[in-house]
């Protein structure tokens, strides 16, 4: 996993060089760098002793930090304490990372960067093994449905068929995406022994 992460970081370096040589391509190159970073994060988290234990909370923080740095936009991630961690199924780790990347990046591009305000929160659902990840920015959703394009099409293609749902809501003056994860995509970790 460490070698894969290093190789992906090398690719990101080459893309940054290309970005400096072709400033007119800045936005699409940054988008690709962000996607590669999200995959790299997975391999970094899997490079630990327990390779199959990628935690949703750690992945969310790492993806948000990467986008925050790349797009120079503050992203506030709120995870309550105490928090019982859940791990992502190994087969879903890369798709979940890319979905989180696309949703947070879209929030940055569609108002979060202009307002310097992107809020990401993890909360327990009604059942113990359900987790809600919300991404909120100032503004209103358009009245008419938006046809899928770009990042939205990628999200639709990568969303797990079972164990993940995406819902758009309006919370006063904030446009909110609620991503709910359930088994088989996530599994609660056992609480540490006393």
How does the language model describe each region?
Residues 181-194:
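C-terminal end segment of the histidine kinase catalytic
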Residues 15-27:
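Short acidic helix/loop segment immediately C-terminal to the autophosphorylated histidine
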Residues 117-129:
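Short beta-strand/loop element within the Bergerat-fold HATPase_c
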Residues 30-41, 45, 52-69, 73:
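Short beta-to-alpha transition helix within the HATPase_c
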Residues 1, 23, 65, 69-116, ...:
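Conserved short strand/loop->alpha-helix "switch" segment adjacent to the catalytic nucleotide/phosphoryl-transfer site
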Residues 131-140:
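Conserved DxG motif in ATP/Mg2+-binding regions
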